[in-house]
Curated annotation (Swiss-Prot):
This is tRNA pseudouridine synthase A. Formation of pseudouridine at positions 38, 39 and 40 in the anticodon stem and loop of transfer RNAs. GO terms for molecular function: RNA binding; tRNA pseudouridine(38-40) synthase activity. Homodimer. It comes from Paracoccus denitrificans (strain Pd 1222).
Length: 261
C-alpha cells in the first residue's frame, strides 16, 4: 500500500486535541473521516499517525502525519480531495507527498518546532481571540530571556512536565528557546520559539507560564535555574493556557515536502 505524508494546518479551538477520542471531536478523527470517503481502508477503520499529539485548544501550522492508502494517488489531487471533504472543519492539508514505506511521521522526525504567542495589553483581543494568551500587565523581555537561558541544552525537565506525562525519561535537549517582541495596538506581543527533537507533555506551556512570571517581576530570572534543578513539579510556575501554542514544523532527515524549511 502506498504511504503518503500529509502537511497539516488546523485551528485547535473546537477540538479535544489531535488524538481520536470516543464521542469527542479530534483532529485525527476529522481527517480519518475525510480519508474514509476516499479510501476503503479508512472507511473500514484504518488510522493515521502524527508527529505530535497536540492537546485540546493547541493549533498547528506544520503538523505532519502519514497514511497508507489503497490507491496510488497523485499527491496534489489527494490534498485537493481531502480539503474538499474536510469542509467546514478548520483543518487544511497544505501538501501531500508520496514517501517510502519506512517513513514514520513520529519516529522518523528529528526535530519539532513550536511557537507560543503571548500578548500583553489591557484591552481584550478581538482578531486574535483564541489564538494567543493575553495578560493585562507589562512584561520585561530582558528578564524573560535571562530566565530562558537557564533552560537551553540537555536537562532533566521533571519540573516542567505534566505529572501525567508518559515519556520514559524526563531528560530532553532544548535546542532553541528564543523570545521576540513586537508592538501591537496598545500593547506588545511576545513570541516564544522552541525547538527540540521531542518535548514532554505540557513542557512548552510550563516553560512559557514560568517565564511569564519572570517577565511580570514575580520571579527573578535565577529562580528558573533553581526550579529546573529541583526536579519537582511543584517548583514550576503556572501552566499557561493552550490557545497561544502552535506546532509550526517537524524536521526530517529527508524532507518529505518540496517546500519544507
Amino acid at each position: 500500500m502506498p504511504r503518503f505524508a500529509l502537511l497539516i494546518e488546523y485551528d485547535g479551538s473546537p477540538f479535544a486535541g489531535w488524538q481520536a477520542q470516543a464521542e469527542r471531536p479530534s483532529v485525527q478523527s476529522t481527517i480519518e473521516a475525510a480519508l474514509g470517503r476516499l479510501d476503503p481502508g479508512f472507511a473500514a477503520g484504518a488510522r493515521i499517525a502524527a508527529a505530535g499529539r497536540t492537546d485540546a485548544g493547541v493549533h498547528a501550522t506544520g503538523q505532519v502525519a502519514h497514511a497508507d492508502l489503497a490507491r496510488d494517488w497523485d499527491p496534489f489531487r489527494l490534498s485537493e480531495a481531502l480539503n474538499w471533504h474536510l469542509k467546514p472543519a478548520p483543518v487544511a492539508i497544505l501538501a501531500a507527498a508520496r514517501v517510502a514505506d519506512d517513513f514514520h511521521a513520529r519516529f522518523s522526525a528529528h526535530e519539532r518546532r513550536y511557537l507560543f504567542r503571548l500578548v500583553a495589553r489591557r484591552a481584550p483581543l478581538t482578531h486574535d481571540r483564541g489564538r494567543a494568551w493575553q495578560v493585562p500587565h507589562r512584561l520585561d523581555l530582558a528578564a524573560m530571556r535571562a530566565g530562558a537561558a537557564h533552560l537551553l541544552g540537555r536537562h532533566d525537565f521533571t519540573t516542567f512536565r505534566s505529572t501525567m506525562c508518559q515519556a520514559n525519561s524526563p531528560v530532553k535537549t532544548l535546542d532553541e528557546l528564543t523570545i521576540d517582541e513586537a508592538e501591537i495596538p496598545q500593547g506588545r506581543e511576545y513570541r516564544f520559539f522552541l525547538r527540540a527533537r521531542s518535548f514532554l507533555h505540557n513542557q512548552v506551556r510550563s516553560i512559557v507560564g514560568t517565564l511569564e512570571r519572570v517577565g511580570a517581576g514575580a520571579w527573578p530570572p535565577g529562580r528558573v535555574a533553581e526550579a529546573l534543578a529541583a526536579c519537582d513539579r511543584a517548583a514550576c510556575g503556572p501552566v499557561c493556557p493552550p490557545q497561544g501554542l502552535y506546532l509550526t514544523g517537524v524536521g526530517y532527515e529527508t524532507p518529505p515536502f518540496s517546500d519544507s524549511r
